[in-house]
A protein has these predicted regions:
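Glycine-rich beta-alpha loop elements in corrinoid/cobalamin-binding modules
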Residues: 4-135
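Radical SAM [4Fe-4S] cluster-binding motif and immediate context
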Residues: 140, 147-187
Length: 187
């Protein structure tokens, strides 16, 4: 974790610093969103994602940054031992984030009781807190994504699939954790 924190600050070796500082940070800071979510789902996204978080926090420490993604789900135990990570983010959502993000937004707008947010890891009074037990979404109760209007260049119908778990065959890809819909494009 110390090496990672060095890399995201290394002006000579990290090409994302100047790119983000010049092209993205000014508009993010000007827009002043209530919540910035950074999803990191592959190891190749760790350095750019954390670099972005660091630059936002340095430019606007009051903006709330939440990190999520499967990388951090796999690193839950390591996150507990990495307090420096919370210098560049306010919290981390592990496992599934639909309910967690909704409750996080509700708490930010209300009592700010982050202990009520499932799957959240955050630092409070210098202590890293991991909200457990971890919550698993019932995918059958989630709304289907709205990809309309469909592009007519791909034909008049197609199938959309969503899978909870990794993108390769594993025990996580049980049939009850998968749903599909058929999408018909308008004529």
């Amino acid at each position: 974790s110390k090496d990672l924190m060095k890399v995201i600050r290394d002006e000579a070796q990290n090409p994302y610093i100047s790119l983000f500082r010049d092209k993205f940070i000014p508009s993010i800071v000007n827009d002043r969103p209530d919540l910035i979510g950074v999803s990191i789902t592959a190891t190749s996204q760790i350095i750019p994602g954390l670099t972005l978080c660091r630059l936002i926090k340095e430019a606007a420490p009051d903006l709330h940054i939440t990190i999520g993604g499967s990388i951090f789900t796999r690193l839950v135990d390591n996150i507990r031992r990495c307090p420096s990570l919370f210098d560049i983010t306010d919290d981390i959502v592990v496992f599934e984030g639909e309910t967690a993000l909704l409750e996080l937004v509700n708490q930010m707008a209300g009592k700010k009781d982050f202990s009520k947010v499932p799957n959240l890891i955050y630092r409070q009074n210098g202590k890293i807190t991991v909200n457990q037990p971890f919550y698993s979404e019932n995918v059958n109760q989630l709304p289907a994504p709205n990809w309309m209007p469909c592009s007519s260049s791909v034909g008049t119908s197609g199938a959309a699939f969503n899978r909870v778990g990794c993108s390769v065959a594993s025990a996580l890809m049980r049939p009850e954790r998968t749903w599909s819909i058929t999408v018909e494009a308008p004529p």
